[in-house]
From Swiss-Prot:
The active site is at residue 62. One of its GO terms (biological process) is carbohydrate derivative metabolic process. Transmembrane segments: none annotated. This is Aldose reductase C. Catalyzes the NADPH-dependent reduction of a wide variety of carbonyl-containing compounds to their corresponding alcohols with a broad range of catalytic efficiencies. It catalyses: an alditol + NAD(+) = an aldose + NADH + H(+); an alditol + NADP(+) = an aldose + NADPH + H(+).
């Protein structure tokens, strides 16, 4: 069993982590994946930015970049927070991997957001879909008779070369990947002229990802944790170990989880539309978990995934299993 090297003595009690290209990423951000109420994401961003957040995580697939752009426009208009104060991440969807589509869709994202450039742009998944429009003017994939996306013969290498062009063009500051396993990364690093700065994956106490982190640390690829609370599908808030640790520090279970990630050097991007919870989630910089408590959380690993590409795409894409 892999033993992590992160402990109470490691100085990860700060707001930012340095990336391998010299840029910095805020260690906790706001996720924007879906909202039943279109206005919710705008309100959440406004609330988050006014309460200390400077990291917003989005994606073209989420379908809300124009709404987010309108919200940011109003926030910037107030004058207290400027574009350069914010670290914005977006992602290239699977149906836009072709070399003639990458720049086009990055530009569309930037225009929808109205922010001039992206701080970080990720390949959302290491799988390409056929685009339903010959000109690639949509992210909607071409589907088979069962409604499942049709896989496109596009290599990650082809897509990554276009991602590198985005940096050269000044459209993005940093580039990275999401949902990549070690084999994907090994291959990518054989030809990448610009090394990915980030690999955004699902990480939480029931899916600790230590082996993946060991590899990423070796090549200075920072992990970012999506679904750090398990999308509400995990019983973290009733877990006796997590509740006991939270009580010890007089913090919430969520705070303990985010702090555990922080002390491992992993950025977290929890999603919430609740005003008080957004504020509470950010409140992790005034305490430090002991080595013993970190090991207790580490012991909870059960390799439970709440976001599986097999069920997500209806395609036999065994990325992790």
């Amino acid at each position: 069993m892999f033993q992590n090297n992160y402990n109470n003595n490691t100085n990860y009690n700060n707001n930012n982590f340095k990336l391998n290209d010299g840029n910095q990423i805020p260690s906790i951000g706001l996720g924007t994946y879906y909202s039943e109420n279109p206005g919710e994401v705008g309100d959440a961003i406004n609330n988050a930015l006014k309460n200390g957040y400077r990291h917003i995580d989005g994606a073209a697939f989420y379908g809300n970049e124009k709404v987010i752009g309108n919200s940011l426009k109003e926030i910037f208009k107030e004058g207290e927070i400027k574009r350069e104060d914010i670290f914005y991440t977006s992602k290239l969807w699977n149906s836009c991997h072709n070399s003639n589509l990458v720049v086009k869709h990055c530009v569309k994202t930037i225009e929808d957001l109205g922010i001039g450039y992206l701080d970080l742009y990720l390949i959302h998944w290491p799988i390409a879909f056929e685009n339903s429009n010959p000109l690639g003017l949509t992210i909607e994939p071409l589907r088979d008779q069962n409604g499942n996306p049709i896989i496109a013969p596009v290599s990650i290498r082809e897509t990554w070369q276009e991602m590198e062009k985005l940096v050269e063009l000044g459209l993005v500051k940093s580039i990275g990947v999401s949902n990549f396993n070690v084999q994907n990364l090994v291959d990518l690093l054989t030809y990448a002229k610009i090394k990915p700065v980030v690999n955004q994956v699902e990480i939480h106490p029931y899916l600790t990802q230590f082996k993946l982190q060991e590899y990423c640390d070796k090549y200075e690829i920072k992990l970012v944790a999506y679904s750090p609370l398990g999308q509400g599908k995990c019983d973290f808030f009733s877990n006796k170990i997590l509740k006991s640790i939270a009580g010890k520090y007089k913090k919430s279970v969520a705070n303990v989880i985010f702090k555990w990630l922080n002390q491992r050097g992993i950025a977290a991007i929890p999603k919430s539309g609740n005003h008080s919870r957004i504020i509470e989630n950010f409140n992790i910089f005034d305490f430090q978990l002991s080595n013993d408590d970190i090991e207790k959380i580490n012991s909870l690993n059960a390799n439970i995934r709440t976001c599986s590409p097999i069920t997500f795409f209806g395609t036999p894409f065994y990325l992790f299993d």
